[in-house]
Structure formats: C-alpha cells, structure tokens
Amino acid sequence: MHDLPDTDFTQRFIFDESDVRGELVALERSYAEVLAKHPYPEPVAQLLGELMAAAALLVGTLKFDGLLILQARSSGAVPLLMVECSSERELRGIARYDETLITPDAGLQDLMPDGSLALTVDPHKGKRYQGIVALDGVDLSESLSNYFVMSEQLGTRFWLKADGHRARGLLLQQLPAAQITDPEERDASWEHVITLASTLTAEEMLGLDNQTILHRLYHEDPVRLFDAQPICFRCSCSRERSANALVSLGLEDAQQLVIEHNGSIEIDCQFCNERYLFDATDVAQLFAGGGVDSPSDTRH
C-alpha cells in the first residue's frame, strides 16, 4: 500500500510485460480552490476540471523545469479555457463564458464549436514550444488524444472526468520498443490496454482509488504502481509582478492612470481574483527605485 497525499496527486504506473506506461491524477482541493474563485456553471466547471486533470497528467510525462499551459479557444459560449501547471505541480485555471448560451447538459462541441487547443511548454531555460490542434473530439479526452496523433509522437490516450467536486484523469502512453519488438504484437498490446481502459465508467473513475481502478482494469496484467506526487493550487500572481506591469508603461502613463482612476490603480488577477492597488505614492516609489515593499492595499 502506498502512502498517498491527502486529496490531490498524480501517480505513475508501468506494465511489466508491455511497453506502456500510465499516469493517474486525482484533484479535489485544488479543483475546489479554482472553482471558489469564480461561480462557473456546471458544464463549464466540468470542462475546466478535465483540463486541469489533463495538465497535471502532462506535467507528469514531461521532463522540464518551467510551465505547461493548456489553452482552448472558440467562438462559442466558452471562448476560453486555460490551465497552467508548473513542473513543481502547482496548478491554476480559468474559464471565460457567456452564461446565456449554456444549457445544463452542454458538452464540449456545444460550448466550444470550431475551437482550437494549444499546448505550450515554457521552460525556465531553453526554447518555448507550442503545438496547436483543432478541438474536434467529442470531448477533451478525445481532442487531447488527437493532438498526440497529429504530432506523430508515441501513442498517447487520455480519459478525463470531472463533476464539479473532483476531477480525475488517466493517461496511457506507448514506450519505445523494449519488451515487445514485433510490430504486430506491439500494436496488439497497445490495443489491449486502451480497450480495457475504455471500459472505465465515469462513476468508477471519480469514485474509486487508483489501486482499485488498476485492479479492475488490469488484474491479469503485471502492473507496478509508483509513489504519488502531490499537486496543489497556487497562483503565480504577486504585487511585484503587478508593479512590473506598471513600470513597463512608463512613469507618465502610470501617473495618468492614477489620475483617471480617482487616485489609485487596481490590477486584478484573472485567475485568483487577488486585487493589487497602487496609489500616487506607490507609483512614485516604483519609479524612484523603491520597490514594492509597502503596499497601500492588497485584497481579495
């Protein structure tokens, strides 16, 4: 039995007799914290939870030091879904929506018709990478799986579920041939594991622990489950970042903004709703090189 982090974690597993690895993710507290920042309609909250689960799974598969960003855009009721997950497994997310266009049973294609999905890896060192694919699957799981098909990488499949309280995800990925080198046997092995994964119901994914899920799916296959890695919600906004945005405007424009906004500038974080206030004294201190050590006001 593995000691698990409280509610939010990823957990890797591998098949001993085939070239396939997997990753499971469970999100509760971080999902709740994201939803607490914005009163999303249920279909939007579900989509955002699925995208959060996907980002956490992807960070588990990539070896990098930096930030992974998943961004879905459309001209429909949900013009934007965006999730960021750092290599330290710190997660945040946001959605934009038009509530008048959302029905209770709306799915991905109802909410985001003709959409696109961008995956960006922004390392602290090295070159930024971005790939874009049409959001043409029946759900986010299929759309993300299609992304990896289009990018001609190793076979990768996603299963994502969220219900407004918890978000769960399963990723399966082919590894380079080692255990099985015959191409036909390799294809059959891959088809075997994804066919079994596709029998997993939403109720099972959202309600069962990882060991039970793996036993139900693969009790005839030798599978090794590794230690869990914790995930948490954390927003990267700060008063310092907001101050840097003001400095980039230049002194004259920053002072003019203070005047236009009745003596203080409010900078709101779109992710967590943190609000940073800067008055004329703060602005003068910034441009005099005094830094941001003495905030006039910062509030939620």
UniProtKB/Swiss-Prot annotation:
Q: Which UniProt keywords apply?
A: Chaperone, Cytoplasm, Disulfide bond, Redox-active center, Zinc
Q: What is its main location?
A: cytoplasm
Question: In what way is this protein post-translationally modified?
Answer: Under oxidizing conditions two disulfide bonds are formed involving the reactive cysteines. Under reducing conditions zinc is bound to the reactive cysteines and the protein is inactive.
Respond yes or no to whether keyword Disulfide bond is given for this record. yes
Give the location in the cell.
Answer: Cytoplasm
Summarizing the function annotation, the protein's role is: Redox regulated molecular chaperone. Protects both thermally unfolding and oxidatively damaged proteins from irreversible aggregation. Plays an important role in the bacterial defense system toward oxidative stress.
Protein name listed in UniProt: 33 kDa chaperonin
- Report the gene name: hslO
